[in-house]
Structure formats: structure tokens, C-alpha cells
Amino acid sequence: MTPETLPIDQYEQQLAEKAARLRQMMLAFQAPEAQIFRSQPAHYRMRAEFRIWHDEDDLYHIMFDPQTKARIRIDHFMPGSPLINALMAEMMTAIRPEPLLRAKLFQIDYLTTQSGEAVVTLIYHRPLDDAWRECAAGLRDALRARGYHIQFIGRANKTKIYLDRDYVDERLTVAGRTLIYQQIENSFTQPNAGINVHMLEWALAATEGAQGDLLELYCGNGNFSLALARHFDRVLATEIAKLSVEAAHYNIAANHIDNVQIVRMSAEEFTQAMRKEREFTRLKEIDLQSYRCETIFVDPPRSGLDEATVSMVQAYPQILYISCNPDSLCRNLSTLSTTHTIERLALFDQFPYTHHMECGVLLVRKATAV
């Protein structure tokens, strides 16, 4: 497999191998059979980063082989969205003959949406000035005239220049409703939009008929918060990354949702607040005791939940856990399964043709643990 080719004829086989591996990992927890959610076999990634190689008069995207570190020229990126591939060709054609855009260009990042928007970030090993801005604006206008809904950003050491804005608005149809998600350049977004919709709809199905309020840790830009808000009286969500919190507030307003509250703090800090170990100014205007959270939703980083957070999570009757690392998920389940039973299990093929697996579990408190 190379970035320009994918073994599409082996897609089902690689997915079956992941499903078998997950099944084996979940045997100890008596989990039900996993629901399997397939990715598109090609053109599934909505974002991509490439180094830029200067070869005399030529200029092209490259990646490095993860094993040999050999340089690989990339003219077509089969995992990337059709818009990424179209823009890759447009950018190289435009930049090669233009010294102001080409000089010491080091990297190009692409962020695209299913709704046809794109942010292209040009990263340089030199200062950027007004001449660069004017030249970049000319390229932006030329591409817009050809129908591209595009934004440009220039980055250099301690410098970020954006001509209009530094984000795109993604529009996803989730269980019959269209949701708007601001996605800010250089902040986390779900890379596989199709699988993201599957995850959102699975989470909605898992919380059908839920009671009371929802507590969410690691909410990002409100990806799950906004979709799940329809099933709960109120949603209280935490996130530590400043850009993601700003995007979450934007998304709440854009979708006219009035029952979601975002707090900028880490899961560990929120655990301390819930245990009344520390007081936080950020929670001053929020009456935690007024929330009737019967369900908690967690989508932690690869490291999973720390021990204190696992202990806090166990207090909730229903736990919805999205994991990008089955190993840390299993480590957490070794504790959570003492008080809760896995009612649902899902495998989301977020990264086809790799060993990575995205999983979802719904845990419900055992009657004996009440």
C-alpha cells in the first residue's frame, strides 16, 4: 500500500481481521457481538498534511515511508477526499512559477468538508509579509472564481496570517437533522466524516429513551454534544483545548441549541470539582447539584481515563464510551465491568488499512451495584 494506491479489494478482509481482534479483546468482559460500521474504501479522509519538496524547477507533495523513511512523491492521495485531491493539483500548478508563494515553502495542510469547503495552510521557513498576503489573495480569488469555496492561511515562526477566516463549516446530516460544525484549522476534528456520522447515529440510538441530563468529558468542538442534546434535558460538557471550546460555543449558536453548557476544564479537574476537592472559578456560575445526570459520555485521548476519572464515571447508571485505543479501553473496562455490564459494542473503521480501531461501548450499571 502507498499513499497513491489502496488495496480496495482487501477492504473487507482487513475489516474482518479488526472485528476478530476486537472480539478476542472483549471476551473477558462478556460483551455482545459488535456492530460493524464500514468506511468508504477510498477518499474518506477530510484532512491531510504533506511536506513540500523543492527539486530545481519542480515542486511537489511528499510523505515519508514510516519504515524506511524514504521520500515518496504524492501527486494523488487516494485516502484523501476528492476536494483534497483536486486542490493538491491546483496548488502545485499555481505555486511552482510564483516565487512569493514558493520560496521556502515547507508544508501544506488541507482541511476539507463534505459540504465543499476547504482551508489550505501554507507553512514556511521564512517571514511572511504584505507581498505574500497579496499574492496569496490573488490565488484565493482565482480559485474561488473557478468554484472552490476556499480559505488560505500562511504560517511561519510565531506568525499566522489568515485572509478571511481560519475555519470551515461542516454540515452533517445525523438521524434526519443537519448539524453545522465549525472546524478550526490546526485543532482536532474527526478525520473520517462518513464514520463520524455513523458514530453520532450509534450514540443517538444508544441513548434513545434516556432520562435526565448528560455529562460529557472531552467534548471537543461539541461533535457529540450537539447531536445528543435532543435526547436529554440538559448537557454539561467539558473540554480543555481553547480553540475547541470556542468552536463548541459557535456550534451551539449556529444550531440554535439552548440546552448545552460548555466548561473549559480537563476531565481530571472536573473530577476534583465533583469530589469537592477543589473549587474552580470556571464553575462559579454553574450549579452542579442541579444536574440530574443519569448518563455520562466520555471520548478520551489514546491514554484512556485516569484512575480517578474511572472511579467518578462509575457513579453513573449509564456510561457511553468512545475509544480510539482498544488497549486503554480494556484497561478501563477491567474496573468499569465490576459495576457495569456492556450492553452495546461497536467497531468504527475510522482508519481503513491500518491497525487502528475506533470502538464504542454502552455500559449499564448492574442491579447488584446499586
UniProtKB/Swiss-Prot annotation:
Q: Which SUPFAM superfamilies does the record associate with it?
A: S-adenosyl-L-methionine-dependent methyltransferases
InterPro entries given for it?
A: MeTrfase_TrmA_AS (IPR030390), MeTrfase_TrmA_CS (IPR030391), SAM-dependent_MTases_sf (IPR029063), TrmA_MeTrfase (IPR011869), U5_MeTrfase_fam (IPR010280)
| Enzyme Commission identifier(s) | 2.1.1.-, 2.1.1.35
Q: Which species is this UniProt entry from?
A: Sodalis glossinidius (strain morsitans)
Q: Where is the active site?
A: 324, 358
User: Which keywords are on file for this protein?
Assistant: Methyltransferase, S-adenosyl-L-methionine, Transferase, tRNA processing
Reaction(s) catalysed (UniProt annotation): uridine(54) in tRNA + S-adenosyl-L-methionine = 5-methyluridine(54) in tRNA + S-adenosyl-L-homocysteine + H(+); uridine(341) in tmRNA + S-adenosyl-L-methionine = 5-methyluridine(341) in tmRNA + S-adenosyl-L-homocysteine + H(+)
Task: Provide the protein name.
Answer: tRNA/tmRNA (uracil-C(5))-methyltransferase
Report the SS bond pairs: none
Return the NCBIfam families for the record.
Answer: trmA_only
**Presence of the UniProt keyword Transferase in the record:** yes
Matching CDD domains, A to Z?
Answer: AdoMet_MTases (cd02440)
The family line of this record is: Belongs to the class I-like SAM-binding methyltransferase superfamily. RNA M5U methyltransferase family. TrmA subfamily.
Q: Which residues form the signal peptide?
A: none
Tell me, in a sentence or two, what this protein's role is: Dual-specificity methyltransferase that catalyzes the formation of 5-methyluridine at position 54 (m5U54) in all tRNAs, and that of position 341 (m5U341) in tmRNA (transfer-mRNA).
Pfam families, alphabetically?
A: tRNA_U5-meth_tr
Task: List residues binding S-adenosyl-L-methionine.
Answer: 190, 218, 223, 239, 299
